[in-house]
Amino acid sequence: MKKILSLLLLVNCQLSTVNCFAQTLTLDECIGKALEYNKSLSSAKMKLDQTTFDMKSYKANFYPQINLLALDFYSTARGEFTIEGGHLPIYSLDASGKYVPNVTVNDDGSYTLNQYADFPSQSMKWKLKNIFVGSVSVMEPLYAGGKISTAYEMSKLGVNMAQENIRLTESEVVVKTHEAYYLAVKAKELGEVARSYKTLLDELKKNVEGAFRHGMSTRNDIMKVQVKQNEAELSIQKADNGYQLALMNLCHIIGLPLTSEVEVVKAEDAPAASSLPVPVEMGVRPEHVILDNKTELARQNVKLTRSDYLPNVAVGASYAYSHGGELAGKKLLNNGSASLGVVVKMPIDLFGGSTNKVRSAKAAYQIAQMEQQDLDEQMQLEWAQSKNLYDEAQTELRLCQTALEQAAENMRLSKQQYEVGFEPLADYLETQAHWQQCSANLVNARCQLQLAYVQLMKASGTLSVH
């Protein structure tokens, strides 16, 4: 017997130690951890970095493009060529100061050189050896049909959409964390309600057993109380299991190991409906901003598509230097050259390809406009539904509070009636069970009100992540 008592004492001490070292987390702390850990949010932030880099790259298209080229190669190619020799006429200066050939006209009209110089054949060798070519070129677009400016504007829209996507993801993380946190709070408080109910039954059982010993009650009364005790034990076990699973789910969301020892605390009550913001429009919601930018992106795409079939004008300049090679023992290449030019490109649409592509882009823009209108109406409907659910949750909470007060008073009166013998045990047990049910309903109503409040804030675009 002493060994059993020692073992129970050791187990209780270990459980107390675990509870003492359990980390107590508030709702704000869980939201902060979830925002740091959430992979979807990290991906959204990386998407913002990507779109920012894209925007900067498109902005660079406004500036001149500068290219450097350097080529150095060695070749063993070599060869020799000969310039054939011949007779070169000799010119004389006449009285008018003009050069005339020194020739004799033959009878057949042909010419015979009176004097000439003999030009011998010339042989020259060449080698490529090492040749270096270097150049620098500058190209500045003057007009590209609006493609450069349109692409830049579209990249800025992409950055804005990425920023709003971060807001949207943050709000989704906050809502998800609220749901997980209040699921744990609900399970914890349901366990407390079940334990309170069990305490009432334990006290009642002692009284019934005492009355049985004095012959004032039957064994059947004891069995009735024991049945309720068993039901209470099962409710406690279910609540504890639900609480552990809810804590594991919360740890998963906030990035802690599933086996972490954590506890949750009761959060503040949700504000009254009269203090809630009533949005005039859905423009503050990130979903609306994303849709608006998506529609504008489709409009800009019409301009971008049209720019492919407009004239393109660019001006360019370059300088090149060449060095290397040998011809007749002397350097062949050793000079530089500069050039300046204008490029004009004018696409010609002979078969309607450009026209149809522009029409297709316009159709996509109209589709985006209709989708935006439809989703705007859906968001307004979502807000109205969230507002109704919040009002209903407040009404349910108020009714549950009243019902619990009535159940507590009914249980008190029933206890008095039972103790003086004016009410059977079954009726008293029924009032206790009713009190336990009203307490559980109140816990559920409080948690549902908090979740309805968060959903309403998200639907109105006023949900803060801080």
What are these regions (language model features)?
Residues M1-I4:
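Positively charged n-region of N-terminal signal peptides that target proteins for export
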Residues L69-S137, A267-A272, G316-I348:
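Small/polar, glycine/serine/threonine/aspartate-rich low-complexity segments that form flexible
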